Regions:
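N-terminal soluble domains immediately following signal/targeting peptides that reside
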Residues: 28-200
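Bacterial N-terminal signal peptides that target proteins for export
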Residues: 2-12
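Cleavable N-terminal signal peptides
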Residues: 15-17, 27
Length: 201
């Protein structure tokens, strides 16, 4: 016959087990999606608008090897960042920007260029079961000799899609490239075919 004390211990054990299991279930499981880098340029600047997962980058999860945040041993760190409100996350990203910037390579005419962070916008997604997008806006100074550029970022940041925005081009002429993690883009020429086709009214 189970004594009263043994019964209490068993009861507490069951309660604690249920609590721990519930905690595990509520851990966020977010699919890792490719980032998207939209770029456009004029005579003075090359501009980027990159849609990414800021929590993923800040937590140092290697997105080149997994497709879900729960597959990483750093998932608890990711979850901690996901619980931050948008202002806290924006401030933290800005604080870490110098380190993040060192993992982004944009070369103009095959030479590394200075990248300026213009601003960051965190989407306000209150459902923690859903990953939230962040937008970072970058600019790189161009000059009259700037002919082409390449883009590459740290493989741990995962795959990224490069997309050109240019109202002077028809859709078929716009540059698009899917980059595997850590792979450098082809050379992208800044003023090649920089006009609308004569067939477009």
């Amino acid at each position: 016959m189970i004594s009263y004390i043994q019964y209490i211990k068993l009861y507490l054990f069951i309660i604690i087990s249920i609590f721990l299991n519930s905690f595990t279930i509520t851990s966020f499981a977010h699919e890792i999606k490719p980032s998207i880098a939209d770029f456009y340029y004029d005579d003075n600047y090359l501009n980027f608008e990159i849609r990414l997962n800021a929590e993923l980058i800040l937590s140092n999860i290697d997105a080149s090897k997994i497709t879900n945040t729960n597959s990483s041993p750093l998932t608890d760190i990711y979850d901690k960042y996901r619980l931050l409100d948008k202002t806290e996350l924006e401030n933290l990203f800005i604080e870490k920007w110098e380190e993040i910037k060192s993992n982004i390579e944009i070369k103009i005419n095959n030479k590394f260029s200075k990248i300026d962070l213009v601003r960051i916008e965190i989407k306000d997604v209150t459902n923690f079961e859903i990953s939230r997008d962040s937008l970072i806006y970058l600019k790189i100074v161009l000059n009259k000799n700037s002919e082409q550029f390449t883009f590459k970022w740290f493989k741990n940041y995962g795959p990224i899609i490069l997309r050109e925005n240019n109202e002077l081009k028809i859709d078929d002429d716009l540059y698009t490239e899917y980059l595997q993690p850590g792979i450098e883009s082809d050379q992208i020429f800044l003023r090649e075919n920089n006009f609308r086709s004569a067939l477009v009214s």
